């Protein structure tokens, strides 16, 4: 597409001669390569030079914003996100129930030791089956999903999963990973692109596709980690973690078989998630899930 904006005839009609034009292109190509290498080095140093230990997940993460910045981002985005899904649900009792269960999960789990002021919202959208978390602790569930849940434990499972995204700092990780992949993709595009060589356009396109697929992979890994954290958190709060399996069945039914192939999705398919949840339950409760947990 760039070549269409700068017709090659313009470069061949200035009296420089063929050899001069080739030398000029080689010189420009060398400069582009050096700049591209510098861009790639900066992206790599910025990413791998920012390492933070997460005491709740027990892993080091590459993150370049603070928890306070996450909270500010979430608070800034919350009103607009709520508006996109019809605003807050008019039923105050239903909103209070969501908030109560969410706060119980936070208060009775490892999430209580995080830096985030959690707040739980029920949105009015009756069509979109969804729940999501913004950076810093703003958590939302739509009426379309809320109305499909059959037990309190299933609602706890949805909210616990979203709490997992927050304490897992997945949004902050994603920001850093996007900056890395964009920096590396930009470096490849800059260093390989040549308006006179159509194959360089294909190289640039391939680099961008690879960057997108890498970010999708990160998204799937985040979902699986949040499932594991959800099992842990709702169990700590007194709910039966097997309720999360029921949530997966509900989501699968709501998708009506219209999901994309797993490789091209930011969410793993339901079978994969159910297997991961069962594995997490076995790890959390090697002697079996105890009696008396809320279903």
Regions found by a protein language model. Name each.
Residues 2-295:
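A Zn2+-metalloprotease active-site environment signal
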């Amino acid at each position: 597409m760039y070549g269409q904006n700068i017709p090659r005839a313009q470069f061949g009609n200035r009296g420089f001669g063929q050899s001069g034009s080739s030398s000029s292109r080689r010189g420009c190509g060398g400069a582009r390569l050096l700049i591209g290498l510098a861009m790639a080095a900066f992206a790599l140093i910025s990413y791998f030079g920012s390492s933070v230990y997460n005491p709740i997940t027990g892993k080091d993460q590459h993150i370049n914003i603070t928890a306070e910045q996450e909270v500010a981002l979430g608070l800034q985005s919350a009103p607009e996100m709520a508006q996109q899904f019809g605003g807050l649900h008019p039923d105050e009792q239903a909103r209070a129930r969501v908030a109560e269960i969410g706060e119980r999960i936070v208060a009775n789990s490892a999430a209580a030791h995080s830096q985030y002021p959690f707040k739980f919202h029920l949105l009015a959208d009756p069509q979109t089956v969804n729940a999501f978390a913004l950076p810093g602790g703003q958590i939302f569930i739509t009426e379309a999903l809320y109305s499909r849940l059959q037990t309190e434990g299933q609602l706890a499972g949805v909210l616990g999963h979203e709490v997992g995204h927050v304490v897992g700092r997945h949004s902050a990780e994603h920001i850093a990973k996007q900056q890395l992949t964009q920096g590396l993709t930009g470096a490849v595009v800059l260093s390989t692109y040549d308006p006179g060589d159509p194959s360089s356009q294909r190289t640039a396109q391939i680099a961008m596709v690879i960057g997108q697929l890498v970010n999708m992979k990160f998204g799937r890994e985040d979902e699986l980690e949040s499932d594991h954290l959800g099992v842990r958190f709702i169990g700590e709060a007194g709910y039966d973690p097997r309720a999360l399996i029921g949530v997966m069945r509900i989501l699968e039914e709501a998708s009506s078989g219209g999901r994309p192939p797993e490789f091209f999705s930011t969410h793993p398919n339901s079978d994969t998630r159910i297997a991961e949840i069962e594995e997490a339950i076995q790890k959390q409760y090697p002697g079996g899930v105890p009696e008396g947990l809320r279903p």
